[in-house]
Amino acid sequence: MSAVSFLYSSKTPKFRGVFNGICALVLFCFFFDRSELLRNPLLRNASFVNGGSGSTSGGITQFMVIRRNARQIETNGSGNNSSLSSSSTVLCSGLHKHMGYADQCEFLKANPICSPDGFFDYLSFFYCSCRDFSILGYMMLGVWLVALFYLLGNTAADYFCCSLEKLSKLLRLPPTVAGVTLLPLGNGAPDVFASIAAFVGTDKGEVGLNSVLGGAVFVTSVVVGIVSLCVADKEVKIDKNCFIRDLSFFLFSLVSLLVILMVGRVTVRIAIAFVSIYVVYAFLVAANVILRKHAKRFKLEALTPLLPMQGSVFSPSVGEDMPMNTPLIETETEDGPPRLQSLPQWMWASNVAIYSNHFAKVSVHDEDRPPWGWIDDTAEVESSSCTKFTSLLEIPLTIPRRLTIPSVEEDTWSKTYAVASVSLAPVLLASLWSSQDDVSLQACGVAYFFSVVIGSTLGFLAYKNTEPDHPPRRFLIPWVLGGFIMSIVWFYMIANELVALLVTFGEIYGINPSILALTVLAWGNSMGDLVSNIALTMNGGDGVQIALSGCYAGPMFNTLVGLGMSMLFGAWSKSPDTYMLPEDKSLFYTLGFLVLGLVWAMVILPRNDMQPSRTLGVGLIAIYLIFVTFRLSCAMGFIPWAA
């Protein structure tokens, strides 16, 4: 906990400031490298001007024409996407030897299809701009990789989860419904949108599959294993009904995914059916709470819900006497019906709170205190020149999002930013739509015109109907929905860059991007789960139940909703044809180890009277180490039959 307190307490803002400053410097270098295109954004659509000839002095038009033609070939039919992928892979495999070319830079200029689909051309930056400074190139790409992980988590913690919390209150959703719908979406947003970006944005479905499944193996093995070791000497019991229910649904979802992977193709109906598994799970959890609420009337004993709906999630005979949280659903009183309360604020960003600037700066009252104890309720950010300087370093990473994501949070309210965000958000949407390869210059002009008109209108209305000292009290739903939608847009943009950068590292090191997704991307997106769940466990009491429930319900949500929505969007883009899933034999091994970890927990915990033990923890960690060793050995060719 000392390390967590050091990094995320309000007394140590220097670390974040220096980190943001370094990331901003790297971002400036990327923009400078892309300066020619930024000076004339219409170059990205220049292929329509030259009719596909692709002959300009700068060479950028030729780059776009080749990339566009490749995508046209891909969209001609679903049966061609695998052949195109394999042909481009064979073509780009000669990057390191660059036979017939002076160096890798000349190879990339002649074969621009090898560059990943991102806003920045990382391969050209590394091999051309950093041609004589490879160490500097490695360092800058590495820093930017960490920055993208941070931006993904920070967007979830400080923007997306806040919108979900407000939306839940405005819609008056019961805590049970919010706990199985909006809450896991907030905590699992980085995994979900990274998967969607891999399927749709960069057409690297194998990266999305390996990222989600690799993260699931990590959380259900390493995180559960460490949690078990932390409480092995304590008298802690896990609710058996809740545990069996979660693992049963998770195993069923993995079997369903296995069938889909074996078929190798997916339609819109199949993708919807896969996502519907989570809908059924959420319905059962909500129904359990309703039955529990009326247990005396129906004489039934309901299952424990995923999240603590009462002061304690344990059975009455087990657990702490003092509840950790205020009850979310109060029992009936003589004065009237039960009073509905909302979920505690800390729950909405529990798995991504380590990325939050908001939690590091804002003090909270005792009733809203997160159980991991990262915040001192009397702590305040020191107003010093050093703090102000580090705040300036954060501007390049924070200002673009604040200028385009509407926010109505009391602590961070600014009328200037509010007016700017509703004015610039339509322009950002138009820019993203215009960046597609099949959009004409005329369509781009029309999109920008309407975006400016809509943005100006919204900005004028926001200016006239808001106050400088507090957020708007009326018409909150449009504000919250705007923040929700623009957070998703930023998720997609950041996740798309993250996947493109991982593909770049795969090209540079000669490593299959699937391995990087299985390890680097999975570990990066799972750091929040690791830190928050261990902190909850060390807090004791109900925290152990919440941590273990999250270790299974979270990966299940990412698998069903993250991969399900990714396959749905992919199938929708190929409709009425079927979407061909990537042929990756290693996915079956990943599923096998994931099922092995779940079965191990399902066998050991009941035999030990539902008490986490060292046997459970050591066994799960050993399973993960064997899994990683096996996958890396396959990738390096040490196990030919499994490659």
Swiss-Prot record:
GO terms for cellular component: cytoplasmic vesicle membrane; endomembrane system; endosome membrane; vacuolar membrane; vacuole. It is a multi-pass membrane protein. It is found in: Vacuole membrane; Endosome membrane. GO terms for molecular function: antiporter activity; manganese ion transmembrane transporter activity; monoatomic cation transmembrane transporter activity; potassium ion transmembrane transporter activity; sodium ion transmembrane transporter activity. Keywords: Antiport, Endosome, Ion transport, Membrane, Potassium, Potassium transport, Sodium, Sodium transport, Transmembrane, Transmembrane helix, Transport, Vacuole. Its main location: membrane. The keyword Membrane applies. Expressed in roots, leaves, stems and flowers. Disruption phenotype: No visible phenotype. Belongs to the Ca(2+):cation antiporter (CaCA) (TC 2.A.19) family. Cation/calcium exchanger (CCX) subfamily. This is Cation/calcium exchanger 3. It comes from Arabidopsis thaliana (Mouse-ear cress). The lineage of its organism: Eukaryota, Viridiplantae, Streptophyta, Embryophyta, Tracheophyta.
